[in-house]
């Protein structure tokens, strides 16, 4: 057993203390206090989420100078969690995407990704991502696999902190 006090087990997707109990970061506790002091009305949000949050999130993701954003060609919706967002995306793509109904997931991918997309009605394929020997990105394998995927394929890319490896592409 590793007793180093700097060690944190993130295998379950949450911080845990040395007894295996949930550990809430001080910054999260402070955010909770600030939100509680705002005296929010606790009303339900519209089904697609908080419109100002969506606008700010789209601007953050695409950039304020994004042509599609300026032309109102970006649609957003708010969901609960990454799992919820993947399920909404999978359902939407299975019903409305007119092309290839296969989604390509990185290898490895989080354990629930495959069933989420399968249960949404998509076929799941995989592309190379992680290299165990270098403990990094297998860029050559990833590019090869994505190049060999059919045109207009659906590809799940992690914007940062690839789940479960934490390995991100670099600008190089």
Q: Which residues does each predicted region cover?
A:
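N-terminal "arm"/small-domain region of PLP-dependent enzymes with the aminotransferase-like
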Residues: 1-49, 56
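Conserved core of the PLP fold type I
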Residues: 29, 39-172
């Amino acid at each position: 057993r590793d007793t180093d006090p700097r060690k944190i087990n993130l295998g379950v997707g949450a911080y845990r203390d040395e007894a295996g109990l949930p550990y809430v970061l001080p910054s999260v506790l402070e955010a909770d206090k600030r939100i509680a002091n705002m005296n929010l009305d606790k009303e339900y949000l519209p089904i697609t989420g908080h419109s100002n949050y969506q606008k700010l999130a789209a601007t953050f993701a695409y950039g304020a100078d994004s042509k599609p954003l300026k032309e109102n060609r970006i649609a957003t919706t708010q969901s609960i969690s990454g799992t919820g967002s993947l399920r909404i995306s999978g359902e939407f793509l299975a019903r409305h995407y007119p092309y290839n109904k296969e989604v390509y997931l990185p290898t490895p991918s989080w354990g629930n990704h495959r069933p989420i997309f399968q249960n949404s009605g998509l076929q799941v394929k995989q592309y190379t991502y992680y290299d165990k020997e270098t403990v990094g990105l297998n860029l050559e394998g990833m590019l090869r696999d994505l190049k060999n995927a059919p045109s207009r394929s659906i590809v799940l890319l992690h914007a940062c902190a690839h789940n479960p490896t934490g390995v991100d592409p670099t600008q190089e």
